Amino acid sequence: MRCYNCYKFSLASFCTHCKEELQDYSLGVRKLEGGLKVYYFYHYDDIKHLLHTKHRFYGYFIFHALARLSFAKFRNFFNPPCFINVIALDDKTYGDYSHTAILAKYLKTKFIKPIFYTLQAKSQVKYSGKSLHFRKTNKRSYELKKIPKYPVILVDDIVTTGLSLLEAKEILEKNNIEVLFALVLANAKFDTI
């Protein structure tokens, strides 16, 4: 087997060196329109080769490994005083798995409960590599399939323009559901607060 990051021999998903490097993140925050805070673990350029595996079979293993190094650690120091639901954006299964559902699963604790297949995009348009104008004119058109009981944390893999997260927040707030913040693996823009 090989390390998914550096391709050196490794029995685990990441070799010892890469695992240490990926564990050494500093949680960043980016503020979107309307005040939505998006917390992220990595800069997009640092892990884009790993993120691009999300539509491949082996991406399943990479996303589990990344979630163990980031989202699972987040839940260890984030101790909410109340119950919270986690919603993964558009967690439909593409191929064999949903990469956003994998990330959401790793946030589960006594007080944090992921709920799956809750917020689904009616539009199947892919945003990867598209312009801001394209993204604004081709919305996700989310549909709320389940009503969460508690305030919500939104989960996605990447924040680029933030339009998907803002659209998700809008539909939830229209249904009187409080959105606390969003949590993503990577930030693809460097206008952080």
Locate each region found by the language model.
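Cys/His-rich microdomains that often coordinate metals
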Residues: 10-11, 22
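Active-site-facing substrate-recognition patch
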Residues: 16-83, 118-148, 186-193
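Short, well-ordered alpha-helices that flank and scaffold nucleotide-derived cofactor binding pockets
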Residues: 76, 105-109, 170, 174
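PRPP-dependent phosphoribosyltransferase catalytic core
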Residues: 166-193
